[in-house]
Amino acid sequence: MSGVWVFNKNGVMRLVENPYNQSAGDSSESSSSGGNQQQRMRRKILVHLPSSEVVSSYGSLEKILKNLGWERYYSGDNTDHLLQFHKRTSIDLISLPRDFSKFNSIHMYDIVVKNPNVFHVRDM
């Protein structure tokens, strides 16, 4: 079960399973907190801080990661649906979906944590 916990206008919390596909039929909440909810659900972007470049493709991300010492990791089982990067100086592994359209904030924050002060996740 995944989703986002939101407050109704009467103060009761509820779980919204998939906030991006929530039906418009729930008008009781949309009038008071719909704007705030939309702000929390904005798309995220990954920004390379030294160059202020927005990462818009795996090509640009791979170039930046290589400059930081990351190498492509080819694992026999996962090559068809995952891109993986590792650093020889650590045990860290970055695993990303091969399809860039499935690259989301979870993957972005994984990159940020493993590369402190180099990347930042921002609202679009």
Swiss-Prot record:
Cross-referenced InterPro entries, in alphabetical order? FPF1
GO BP of this protein: regulation of flower development
Q: Where is the composition biased (Low complexity)?
A: 22-39
Signal peptide: which range, if any?
A: none
Tissues with expression: Expressed in roots, flowers, and at a low level, in leaves.
Q: Where is this region: Disordered?
A: 19-42
Q: Which family is annotated?
A: Belongs to the FPF1 family.
Relate the protein's function as given in its record.
Modulates the competence to flowering of apical meristems.
- Further information: Overexpression of FLP1 results in shortening of the time to flowering.
Q: What is this protein called?
A: Flowering-promoting factor 1-like protein 1
Gene coding for it: FLP1
